[in-house]
Amino acid sequence: MSLELHFAVSQFLYKKAELCDNYDWDAYIDLYDEDSEYHIPQWIDDHNYVQDPNQGLSYIYYEDRSGLEDRVFRIRTGKAASATPLPRTQHNIHNVQVKTLEDGLIEAKVSWRTLYNRQGLEGCFYGRATYVLRPTEDSFRIRRQHSVLLNDKIDSVLDFYHV
């Protein structure tokens, strides 16, 4: 793994965070391949979480990008009461580890923290995520996002824009 690749992947993930914080949903969704998987599993116990979304519960599971597109549609049209009003968010990505997979895809493992404020309630979600990225001519596309939420309590709504 080269320093140039690490830098490019890090910048891509920082841009993803910025797009989400700025509610730039079209550009945000465009970062995902059409058939990209998005998964936030639930915990089974203190040290094990659901590995297969078809065999256990998940906080969020989208088999492909259409799940994110549907969620954004509901937010934009006011049909998502849990997201009205949207929270202000600040996504932080750190401890980025990058490696090239045998099939030419890129794996990026990160730690993340999202601070949010909605209707006077401030909070923080944090965890780890693994991305599988497909290199493009000038950037990357997300093939898979697997985020593990480390919070024990969810005192508010948990949605894709919190992760």
From Swiss-Prot:
Any single GO BP term: 3-phenylpropionate catabolic process
Top-level taxon in the UniProt lineage: Bacteria
GO molecular function: anthranilate 1,2-dioxygenase (deaminating, decarboxylating) activity
Entry EC number(s): 1.14.12.1
Pathway: Aromatic compound metabolism; anthranilate degradation via hydroxylation; catechol from anthranilate: step 1/1
Catalytically driven reaction(s): anthranilate + NADH + O2 + 3 H(+) = catechol + NH4(+) + CO2 + NAD(+); anthranilate + NADPH + O2 + 3 H(+) = catechol + NH4(+) + CO2 + NADP(+)
Gene3D superfamilies, A to Z: 3.10.450.50
Signal sequence, start to end: none
Stated pH dependence: Optimum pH is 6.3 for the reverse reaction.
Enzyme's top EC category: oxidoreductase
UniProt entry keywords in alphabetical sequence: Aromatic hydrocarbons catabolism, Dioxygenase, NAD, Oxidoreductase
Family annotation (InterPro entries): Anthranilate_1-2-diOase_ssu (IPR017640), NTF2-like_dom_sf (IPR032710), Rng_hydr_dOase-bsu (IPR000391)
UniProt keyword Oxidoreductase present: yes
Family, as annotated: Belongs to the bacterial ring-hydroxylating dioxygenase beta subunit family.
Subunit structure: The anthranilate dioxygenase (AntDO) multicomponent enzyme system is composed of an oxygenase component and a NADH:acceptor reductase component (AntC). The oxygenase component is a heterohexamer of 3 large (AntA) and 3 small (AntB) subunits.
Function: Component of anthranilate dioxygenase multicomponent enzyme system which catalyzes the incorporation of both atoms of molecular oxygen into anthranilate to form catechol.
Protein's name in the database: Anthranilate 1,2-dioxygenase small subunit
Organism: Acinetobacter baylyi (strain ATCC 33305 / BD413 / ADP1)
